[in-house]
Amino acid sequence: IGHSYSLNKGDEFNCNVFGGWVEYAHGVDGYKDTFKNIEKVVIPSKVTQLEDTAFAGLRNLKKVILSDAITVIPGEAFYGCKRLSSITLPKSLTTIEHTAFADCNALKKVTLSSECRTMKVKNGCLLSKNGRTLWWVAPGLKKVTVPDTVRVIKEYAAANKVVTKVTLGKKVSDIRTFAFQSRKLKDIQIKKGNKTIAKKGQCIYNKKNGTLLVGIAKNKKLKICSKVKKLDEQVLSLAGIRYLVRLDIPSSVKTLNGRWTENIEVSSSGKIFFHGAEPPRVMGAVDESVCYVPIFLKVYVPKKSLKKYKRWYKAQDALSYVTLKTIS
């Protein structure tokens, strides 16, 4: 069900089944007055596939009955269904895209038949059948308790608009990129006994290698703690805000990997402070179209190290795109 004949993955525009144009990147959910009275959708049992944005923009939708033959719930399939408060997922489910229920901020109750061979639901969390991987969190939950069986939290798992508090279980050891990229998330706790990750100040980090996993903004600022040694695009999330006004990077940070500045974004009028006497090592695939150091803002460095940081920026072909200042 849905439009696919002329629309490709990654297109900015797409259509719902009623012809409403959807542009997720710019907040257009496809709503039209012509389908404002639709409150229930029943997908026939013969349907095996949904297309992206198929039922996006049904803002008054309250009930959905999905075909149990559906294996994948694609991106923005029910984007903007603001009154949808519960859903029973199909028992053939193998994959759910993180934006499948984007902006469904009332969706708190999720159920799934025990007959599903690949997944199960607990605490509003969609898990792998063995409980070790967290794939997705119901987007209407304000408080999330990650089950103790979970070890891996997948990309964008709890990146929604309403979550304010997350409690991580004892076995969580792997948190993927943007897992907790939520502007209202102010509080992340870790249960006692976790041997791999820890919290200090505004940071959730890996105790074994010092990689920052989640930065929690406070007053639009993030001060990275001295336990952190590495910023890595593959695992990093910023919680509590979209754009920081100040980011402090301590001397303990020795490595910057990939496009980490896209994970922790600082506003163009903001400031970044590098406190290390030596600039961190820059890693990542060589891509001339990508800059792996902060640009288009003010960057503050130790006065005695100004020349070193200038050489560092020059080596990245980025010196002309940054305003370097010294820490007083």
Feature locations, PLM:
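Structural signature of tandem-repeat unit edges
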Residues: 1-12, 33-49, 58-72, 81-95, ...
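A composition-driven surface/loop motif
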Residues: 7-20, 26
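Short beta-strand-turn/beta-hairpin segments enriched in glycine/proline and small hydrophobics
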Residues: 23, 29-32
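Consensus positions within tandem repeat domains that build extended binding/scaffold surfaces
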Residues: 31, 51-54, 74-77, 98-100, ...
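Short, aromatic/basic amphipathic alpha-helical patches
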Residues: 179, 259-260, 284-292, 307-323
